[in-house]
Amino acid sequence: MIFNLEDNTLNDKYKLMAQTIIPRPIAWVVTEDEGVINIAPFSYFIGLSSNPATVLISVGHKSDGTAKDTLANIRKNKKCTICMVDKANLDKMHFSSKELAHNSSEASEYNIETTRVFELFPPMIESVPCAYFCDFNQEIDLGGGDTIPLVLNVRKIYVKDENIVDKERISIEFDPVARIGKSYASLGEELVAPKMP
């Protein structure tokens, strides 16, 4: 079956892509404005390059058509902290996807503990295994639509000591949660690559 995306509705496009581009890592993004901490998850999230270290997140709009707080805060303050989600944080991450009023904080609403590691960046979520401290690189204009891709420079990376199994080789292990359609999944069995012929 062929789906013509020029004819399909926006909801159809999302359903098709969200269920076939899988699994998708989740960026649990922390931003801050005038003392209010905003936390929201985004699964349109990829690493663009390790040199220069850059990632991309795509941020939509609120139900009333205005910019989500994450987008507004990054546009204004040029900073964010991206936390990687593991199974232990699944519930609170999911709850933080609910739309709140602009001056409300998911941190207080859902009892999400944060800790400030660097003064120049928003705090990270205390319980996560890994966090990226980022600043704004550029916004990509897709020529309309409801989603705004943001390219972010990764300036510092935090990894919990207990998740670094080999410090010399920088070998890191944790149990990430991925997005598949409207559901979540863990990675499960690790597959070993076959030897090249």
Segments the model singles out, each with a brief description of its role:
Residues M1-P197:
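Basic, polyanion-binding surface patches
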